[in-house]
């Protein structure tokens, strides 16, 4: 005969056994490219979704947190060659591929993931009408391992169907100086 205590313990064990393993899984590592990009876009989509992603490049500390050492160096070189008072070579928000951030929702796809490199593609949707060219909604993040941590080594996208890359834009700005 079952006692009330045995019945309760059996029911509790059944509930625990049926609970999703994800409920007990560790949260995603901040050193995981998908988790990093997800965190960037979760922040960019907050509120009205107009905050953008400038926080990843707003100062040297932010750049060091998110970007690879080689990209930080390249950016510093480009900034050093920008005349005082001028806007640097990156004059838009690369996270939202815009001058006026608008992120309502986003979808991440891992295009490549191996031991030292990763490519994460993000398709963003805003509150306003989508761009005429669908490829303008996709931003790609190229990651590399930098001192054992995943860092963004390039951000790329398209405007009016024409591709752009942060790394290429920075390199091009240095060519214009020489």
Give each language-model segment a name.
Residues 12-15, 119:
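Localized chelating/binding microdomains
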Residues 27-86:
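Core segments of small alpha/beta cavity-forming domains
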Residues 67-134:
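Surface-exposed, charged secondary-structure patches
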Residues 108, 139-144:
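Hydrophobic/aromatic beta-strand elements that line small-molecule binding cavities or substrate pockets
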């Amino acid at each position: 005969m079952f006692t009330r205590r045995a019945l309760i313990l059996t029911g509790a064990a059944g509930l625990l056994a049926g609970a999703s393993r994800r409920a007990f899984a560790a949260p995603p590592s901040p050193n995981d490219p998908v988790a990093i990009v997800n965190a960037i876009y979760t922040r960019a989509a907050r509120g009205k979704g107009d905050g953008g992603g400038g926080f990843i490049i707003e100062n040297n500390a932010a750049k060091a947190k998110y970007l690879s050492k080689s990209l930080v160096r390249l950016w510093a070189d480009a900034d050093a060659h920008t005349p005082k008072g001028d806007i640097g070579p990156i004059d838009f928000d690369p996270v939202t591929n815009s001058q006026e951030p608008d992120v309502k929702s986003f979808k991440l796809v891992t295009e490549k993931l191996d031991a030292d490199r990763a490519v994460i593609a993000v398709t963003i949707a805003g509150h306003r009408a989508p761009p005429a060219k669908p490829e303008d909604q996709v931003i790609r993040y190229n990651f590399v391992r930098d001192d054992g941590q995943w860092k963004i080594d390039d951000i790329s996208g398209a405007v009016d169907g024409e591709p752009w890359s942060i790394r290429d834009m920075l390199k091009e700005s240095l060519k214009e100086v020489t």
